[in-house]
Every structure is written in C-alpha cells, then in structure tokens.
Swiss-Prot record:
GO terms for biological process: translation. Forms part of the ribosomal stalk which helps the ribosome interact with GTP-bound translation factors. Disulfide bonds: none annotated. One of its GO terms (cellular component) is large ribosomal subunit. This is Large ribosomal subunit protein uL11. Belongs to the universal ribosomal protein uL11 family. The gene is rpl11. It comes from the Archaea.
C-alpha cells in the first residue's frame, strides 16, 4: 500500500502539486481522486486540511481518502473570522473569543488532542490562542488557563 499525505485547502484540491506529481505515477484517475477529496473537505472551506490518500491496490486502482482535522489555529481563525494571528502578541490582539467559542473548537478537535477530558482539551486550545494573540472574553488566555486550573471557571 502506498500512502500520500498532504495539506489541501478545503474543497479546493487540484490535480497540480502536491497531489498530481505524487499520485500520477501510480496510475490513478487524478480527476476522480481530486473530486473525492474536494467532496470530503468542502466543509473546511478556507482552511488547510490534512489529507491522506491510501492506494490500497495499485493494480485495481483502489484507494481510500482519510481527512484529518484541521490545525487548531485554523479552527480558531475560522471561528473568529480572522485571516491570521497577531504578529506581535504582546502589543497586538488578533481577535477576542468567547469561552463558548473555545469550547466549540476543543470539541471539534477532541479526537486529535492528547487530552483525556474536555477540560484538558480547552486548556490545549487556549494554548493555541496564546500563540495566535487571541484573547478570551477580553482576558489573556494564560489567565483563563490559570482560572480553569484553580477551579474558578468550570468546564
């Protein structure tokens, strides 16, 4: 079995690089593979999505497409409707999320995170918010993390 892993924009995969050069030599119908990828990733429009194409049997051209969960940063940016994070996190704020928005992103990433419970998942997403320069209910995400750990905020 041959596996081709790549990142594509949701619903906008093309037969060009990186998919074409990787899958072309395997003899697959690139148009059909791209159509299948776009169908499976259309809900992630505007976000980079990890995709794996497993060529199960090159002789029969049988393949499967596995779509991963977009990076936490992409989900946060989509949720807030922002293009990119703050370039200088200390001086500039890229956006402000509500705790509910953070929980929503944590829920959608739950299967891909290392956390055992929702509280841990929320703490991980808050870590990404720090990196992007996103505040949570007007507070620094690190402050919100401390409040959750101290039991001041229930998840």
């Amino acid at each position: 079995m041959v596996a081709v892993k790549t990142m594509v924009e949701g619903g906008k995969a093309t037969t060009g690089p990186p998919l074409g050069p990787a899958l072309g030599p395997l003899g697959l119908n690139l148009g059909q593979v791209v159509k299948d990828i776009n169908e499976k990733t259309k809900n992630f429009a505007g976000m980079q999505v990890p995709v794996t194409v497993n060529v199960i049997d090159p002789a029969t051209k049988k393949y499967e497409i596995i779509v991963g969960v977009p990076p936490t940063s992409a989900l946060l940016k989509k949720e807030l409707g922002i293009e990119k994070g703050a370039s200088k996190k200390k001086e500039k704020i890229a956006g402000n999320a509500t705790l509910e928005q953070i929980k929503k992103v944590a829920e959608s990433k739950r299967s891909a995170l290392l956390s055992y419970n929702m509280k841990g998942a929320v703490l991980e997403v808050l870590g990404s918010a720090v990196s992007l320069g996103i505040t949570v209910d007007g507070r620094d995400p690190k402050e919100v993390q401390k409040m959750i750990k101290n039991g001041e905020i229930e998840i």
